[in-house]
Structures are given as C-alpha cells and as structure tokens.
Amino acid sequence: QHPVAGDLKCKLTGRMLMDGGVYLKNDNLFGNGTEFNDLRLGVKATYQNWSMKMEVGYVGNKVSIKDAFAAYTSGKHIIQVGQFYEPFTLDMLCSTYDLRFHQSPGIVLALTNGRRMGTSYTYNGKHYYASGGFFTDSDLGNVKNISQGYAIDGRLVYRPVNEEGKLLHIGAAVVYRTPDSALPGDEDENTFIYKSPGVSTIDNRNLIYAKVDHAKYQLKQGVELMIAHQRFFLQGEYIRTMVKREQNFTNYAGHGGYVQCSWLLTGRQYGYDEALACPGRPVGRALELCGRFNILDMNNEEAGVWGGAQKDFSLGVNYYMNKHIGMKLAYSWVMPGKHIKEISDKNFSVVQLRFQMIL
C-alpha cells in the first residue's frame, strides 16, 4: 500500500488462478487441458470515508472490466455506485480466491447474474445485515444499444452468533428483474437465459441452458445458511426463479440448491467478510478437506422449457500456504439428468488442480 498526498492511499492488486483438468470416464469426449480461470490486475484507493476499486480481468481469451465502483462508508452504512455484483446469493458474492472449489455450484452459476451497473445501500451491523440496490442490465464489457432491463435487489442476513471463530448466518434474498428490449426482429426480445458449465470450465460447454421467451419479468428468491465453529464450516443455499410470461404462455420456474462443508486438518479457524456477509478463506496457513453436493432442475414441462437437470458431488483438498498463495485439488462426479445440453446423460468425472495467488 502506497500513501499519496494527504489522506489518499493507493494499492495495486492482482490475482492469478491457474487450473488444469483431466476428465475421467469420458464418454462425452471432453477436452483435457489448462486455463487461467481468473487473471486480474487492479487498483484500490481510499480517501477519508471514500473508497474506489477498479479491476481488469482476462478470462476465456477475453479482456473485460471486473469491479469498477466507488463507495462511501459512514459507521455501519455503505453507499456504493458503479459496476459490481448484485446482493444476491451467498456464493457469488464470495471472491473466486476464497471459493472452496474451482467453480461456484451449478445452481448459483445458472441463477445469478454477473456484475452489473447500479447503486446499492448496505447496513452492516454485528448481528443484522441488510443490502438493497437498483441495477440496469448493462456491464462495461457488454454495452447494449437497446433499452436495458432493470433489477431491484434485496438481501437480509441475521447473525445471532458473530464472534471470532464462531458464526451462525441466516439469510434471504430476492431479485425482481425485467428483460431487455431488442432490435427489430431480434429473437432474444423479452427473453431470459439461464446457463451453467457445471463443475469445470476446462471444457466450457454449457450443460444447463434454459431459454425462456415472451417474458414480462422474473422473480428470483434465495435462502442461505452458514455455520462456522473453529475448524468446522458449513454452507448451503436454495435458489428459485419464476418467470412471468405474456398472455397465452405458461409461467416458467426452475430451482436447485447445494450444501457444502469443510474441516481444517491444520489451521485455526475460518475468516468471514462482514461487509459482504460472505465466507472468507481460512486464517493463516491451513490444510482443508471439503465436500459439496449440488442439484438443479431447469426443466419445466408446463412451460415447454427444457433447460436440463444435473446433480454433482465433489471432494477437495486445499492448502493455503499463507493469505496470498494456495493450491486446490478436487474430484467431481457429475450425474446429468433429463434434457442435459451438449452431452449424453452418462455420468462422468473430472479431476482438477489449481495454483492461486492474490495480492
């Protein structure tokens, strides 16, 4: 961190997540290989009660703007404006560096948006947390020349236990979103799309892909639970979406959830980001054993939408050398369901290794 004139302080930031993966029982001819899952360079600055963050990322052979926002903090109150994640779902708000596995659960990837431009207000108390915001459907990497949809988000968290090494976190969130308009003749007019690549992006086919047209709005709801006690950690969410469609079209619904737990074989305890109300990495040097089960169903017979269904189970071992450097090894067993996309419905597995460094 480099002090500048007056109270202004600046800090360069960086992140590198390098993955390698091998698919086993590979009837779908998945491609093995390596990739940069996340590669970033950015800057953070603070001035009195103000802060700013800007990051540029490289993912999938594409350079894009990640976080780009300013925030004003006064005691327990935070006002934020710019491009950042909407306050919805526990795992999506978590830093990619702090994820227990290589990807967020499939249901989180399918039912959450990326960063969007907007503004939010957050109350961050010791036991009570509330965040709400207004967002457009635009981001700096996808500027649209059409009338953008908008979203109104809200998230509430109750933390009856919130002390060092001990946490009980219970939360709920909701999003109301309207679709984008479209250029004349555009087939994506008034359409919502839900998609997920599953447990890995080494082969980046979308296993889940639900396209819901003739949409008026969508309402997404989620509930979340997090428990931490010294070396033990438990996290779970259930998420549902409902799309209200135009007259003569049946409404659509998709849903799913996950539960994951972990245990520190070495190390003291787990961190917790109170400002975002989301999990952090283990404190100091640590060796972690973790497991996760994820399920999602984006098929809806009444609406005539077949987005696919999937279950998967993952086991992982993570080693955190310090707060900057770590390695992750994970094995995932994937059980495709009805109407899975781009592949057969035969079970398959994948082994992944990650080296990660953050500054």
Language-model-derived ranges and their functions:
Residues H2-L140, K144-D180, Y258, W263-R268, ...:
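Outer membrane beta-barrel
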Residues D27-N28, D186-L359:
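Outer-membrane beta-barrel pore domains
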